[in-house]
A protein has these predicted regions:
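Oxyanion-binding and handling regions
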Residues: 1-20, 31-34, 88-217
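Residue-level signal for alpha-helix termini/capping positions
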Residues: 45-48, 81, 101-102, 186
Length: 217
């Protein structure tokens, strides 16, 4: 199995290739100067694989940078249209908590991601050596709410230290996405059109009512 992971939900973009157990990852922060396909070519070269050998593509669905997530989904959809490839979306929150587990954090750990407008996406897990269990589902909290919990909480996430200096900076990575996919006993692949960013806010626009003006004769 050759799995390509694409994680663009945070300021640290990454792609990773797991080719028959050989893993390579390319990361880029901030400027995003390297096109996604250039990053993919890099990991293909490092694993001595070809594009044609990629049979599975995993996408980080966020929440996070809506533009980045949309770009990753568009890449996956285009790849599926061009050839026979299986697609799977995984929450970037799950990738972050998996990395927190790898870094041996234990107890209650909250993933905190910037949601703009002085708000944050937040989900809490109980983490032990054996794994992690969600105890507070992903939801949106205000800055004041997050600050009120900061003294006793273990906060992790991309850019978390901008608001909470005691937090642990942890980014979701494409390598972690591939590991999470391989660890699943059942994988429910989806057609490209079913991949959607995780976005908890209601739609910001309202459809205009039909015009009441009489039609022109």
């Amino acid at each position: 199995m050759t799995i390509l992971g694409v994680e663009f939900s945070s300021p640290q973009r990454s792609v990773a290739l797991n080719h028959n157990g050989v893993v390579a990852e390319a990361r880029e922060e901030g400027g995003r100067h390297t096109p996604a396909l250039g990053m993919i070519e890099k990991v293909l070269a490092e694993t001595a694989a070809t594009r044609q050998e990629i049979d599975t593509l995993i996408v980080g669905l966020g929440p996070g940078s809506y533009t980045g997530i949309r770009a990753a989904i568009a890449l996956a959809q285009g790849w599926q249209l061009a050839g026979d490839i299986k697609l799977l979306g995984i929450s970037s929150v799950e990738a972050i908590i998996a990395r927190a587990h790898e870094e041996q954090l234990t107890g209650q750990v909250s993933v905190v991601i910037d949601a703009q407008r002085q708000e944050f996406y937040l989900a809490t897990y109980e983490v032990s050596a054996a794994g992690w269990t969600e105890i507070e589902p992903l939801h949106i909290v205000t800055l004041a709410e997050a600050q009120s919990r900061a003294a006793t909480a273990q906060y992790v996430g991309p850019e978390v230290t901008r608001w909470f200096p005691a937090g642990r900076l942890i980014f979701p990575t494409a390598t972690t996405l591939t590991h999470l996919a391989l660890a699943r006993t059942r994988i429910h692949f989806v057609p490209g059109e079913q991949l959607e960013p995780i976005y908890l806010r209601e739609t910001a626009f309202v459809k205009a009512p039909p015009s009441r003006l009489p039609k022109a004769l």
